[in-house]
Amino acid sequence: MEAYEDIKLIACDMDGTLLDEHSQVPPETFDLVRALDGAGIRFVAASGRRYDTLRTFFEPVADRMDFVASNGAQVFVRGKLVDREVFSHAALRRLYALVNEFDNLHMVVYDRTNSYLLDDPACFDAEFDKDLPNPVVLRDLPSPDTSIVKVSISCDSAQMDMAYILSRELEADFVFAPSGVKWIDVMQRGVNKATGINQVLAAHGVAAENVMAFGDSMNDYEILRMVGHSCAMGNGRWAVKQISKRIIGKNTEQAVQAELRAVVESRAIGHHAFETE
């Protein structure tokens, strides 16, 4: 049985992890976040999604948690921005040129408010509900004075092969991590969820060994490697399961919520911790 007594912070991925099969936050989650906060355990959403999208998901409890967004490029602690890593325009130009060599790749770049689709919108329709807010169709990269905080590539086929090819070509600039069914997350080298979480830990004075983390995809790899209590989803990628200390149920079974409930109950605060607002 898992020992929860030393946990001081919980970091959780969103898609394929905390969200249900309809890409929604199960309602019980909000009471669990309140209960964790009441027990002195900080909850952190750690996702490839942008901060504005994450905050909307957690609006009822957003002021009682922290956010590592855009795969570590946006870090918010106690409601304040503590770090933002902007992509180099020159590096993006190299990536865009490479993506254009492959018919099965379609690139999206994001600033704080918009999603810039650098291909025919029809290429993205299959997962158009996957964090593409305020879409703007462009035929080239936005201007260099646009602060790009996130980059994703939609892949029609051979996702793992394409991630390998992109890495071979541009490994000095980026890290490429397969995510979801057909996406490849593009991260600046040296920037990932783990680097973002490290900033949150420093702000709260928490050690990595006192962190529980949940994830399912390769963009969760570094953080699961780092923490004391790593939990891979039953629906997660094989490599993520291999390096995690535990494998729990699937997101469709609300397995994360069950684990959060167990943490709350381990603090002997029972149902009294579950506030309602």
Language model regions located:
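Mg2+-dependent phosphoryl-transfer enzymes with acidic/Ser/Thr/Gly-rich catalytic loops
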Residues: E2-L9, P26, V186-E277
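Active-site phosphate-binding/coordination module
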Residues: H22-F124
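Asp-based phosphoryl-transfer active-site loop
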Residues: D6-H22
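Hydrophobic packing residues within well-ordered alpha-helices of enzyme cores
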Residues: T29, L54-F58, A163, V240, ...
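Alpha-helical scaffold elements within enzyme catalytic domains, especially in hydrolases
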Residues: A35, A97-L98, L166-R168, A239
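Short, structured coil segments at secondary-structure junctions
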Residues: P60-D63, N71, E169-A172, M226-V227, ...
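Conserved acidic, metal-coordinating active-site core of Asp-based
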Residues: D103-F214, M218-M226, N235
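Short active-site oxyanion
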Residues: G38-V44, D63-M65, V149-K150, E209-N210, ...
